[in-house]
Amino acid sequence: MIKPRTPPGTLELLPREQIAFQRMLDVIRRNYERFGFLPVETPVFELSDVLLTKSGGETERQVYFVQSTGALANAAESGDRSLPEMALRFDLTVPLARYVAEHEHELTFPFRRYQMQRVYRGERAQRGRFREFYQCDIDVIGKDSLSVRYDAEVLAVIHAVFSELRIGDFSIQLNNRKLMRGFFESLGVAEGERQLAVLREVDKLDKRGADYVRETLVGEGFEIPAEQVEKILAFVAVRSQGHADALAQLATLEADAGSSEILRTGVAELREVLQLVQALGVPETAYCLNFSIARGLDYYTGTVYETTLTDHPQIGSICSGGRYEDLASHYSKSKLPGVGISIGLSRLFWQLREAGLIDGIEGSSVQALVALMDEQGMPQSLDIARRLRAGGINTEVQMEPKKIGKQFQYAAKAGIRFVVLAGEDELARGVVAVKDLLREQQFEVSRDGLASTLQVELEQSKVM
């Protein structure tokens, strides 16, 4: 007999956890749509030569290739060592680039899309790291140009999503890559690849600490003078406290910009984002400047975002993204700038569960169980269930008569809030008895008013 087991690096949930996960997906989708984003789905696998625009490197080592058994046998016979034709997507950005380039003349720009699908990476399986996981992305793609105003709107989307998820206080930290590039240029760190390497080291500041970054930058491979490294560390230590302080920090930076045009541009862009965020109604307690935010991916060119939970910094980033200049350069001659974010929901859910922050979420999608007292009551139980479902109540029927205590136990274990009972006495009076397991109380209500009464109870519990 084969031992049942799940593959390492996957997140398989029991029904009550799956319901909580699904509700988080629903909240994210609802907020994406409120801001006018359109749904897109792409195939789980892409053509290998389309997906892997860069040969070799860490990305290719983590890609899962797809090959039929027939193709595998043919390759073995012929000695063909070329890459399989298909590969599983490792993020949603590359498929988006292919999608926009392929459908460029059918889409309306700026193109606002959201995508919530699983992606696959062959990482080493360990706690909190997954090989299969959900990403929930939004992007606004322009043609030739895209206003920085969209950067502010994306920040407002982040705020709306995590406000409704109600998983605790959070902070949206933002920066602009142009600030860092301009500042480094003023220190003489202007070479393209060298500057990107420094940015990647700075991005490790929160995880590895200032001493590690200092030692790396003065050491072999960088050899930046200690005095300049201290200036870099002082720059990336900047954090704003409130909206007015954020604008003041930018004003100070602008005054010290000297001849750096790129730094001035970054200041102007970030200032406009801050002003529009305030107009969008995002409270100043929800965001701050953090000049250490660089984002490891090299294609970010302007605004960058990192979102963290205030009371659980150990969880790390729960949402990140930024501005890029040319999404589909590998697939199209058109310039397609954009701005977007991604929520890695599988990892976030796992971290929240580990931190005990999922416990308060209602446990079942079934709202009512119609109990069965005896065989003769089956038609009445089915009629009550029909009425409840017609009234919008998710309802399960007990199909075999059992002791009422066991039916209560079943409902409690399954996370069902209401148990509806209709014995001979209740039927004779045209009422049903309802046991509310959440409030631990029982009441009677007319059969005609049952569904509306339960709807009111459910709505009231949402407000509590």
Curated annotation (Swiss-Prot):
Matching InterPro entries: aa-tRNA-synth_II, aa-tRNA-synth_II/BPL/LPL, Anticodon-bd, Anticodon-bd_dom_sf, His-tRNA-ligase, HisRS-like_core, HisRS/HisZ, HisRS_anticodon
Keyword Hydrolase tagged: no
Pfam families xref list: HGTP_anticodon, tRNA-synt_His
Catalytic activity: tRNA(His) + L-histidine + ATP = L-histidyl-tRNA(His) + AMP + diphosphate + H(+)
EC class: ligase
Keyword tags: Aminoacyl-tRNA synthetase, ATP-binding, Cytoplasm, Ligase, Nucleotide-binding, Protein biosynthesis
Domain of life: Bacteria
Segments passing through the bilayer: none
Entry-linked Gene3D superfamilies: Anticodon-binding domain, Bira Bifunctional Protein, Domain 2
PROSITE patterns recorded: AA_TRNA_LIGASE_II
UniProt-listed GO biological process terms: histidyl-tRNA aminoacylation
Subcellular localization: Cytoplasm
Enzyme Commission (EC) number: 6.1.1.21
CDD domains with a match to the protein in the record: HisRS-like_core, HisRS_anticodon
A Gene Ontology term for the protein's cellular component: cytoplasm
Secretion signal, residue range per the UniProt entry: none
One MF annotation (Gene Ontology) recorded for this entry: ATP binding
Family label: Belongs to the class-II aminoacyl-tRNA synthetase family.
Subunit structure, interactors included: Homodimer.
PANTHER family documented for this protein: HISTIDINE--TRNA LIGASE (PTHR11476:SF7), HISTIDYL-TRNA SYNTHETASE (PTHR11476)
NCBIfam families to which the protein is assigned, alphabetical: hisS (TIGR00442)
Name assigned to this protein: Histidine--tRNA ligase
Record organism: Stenotrophomonas maltophilia (strain K279a)
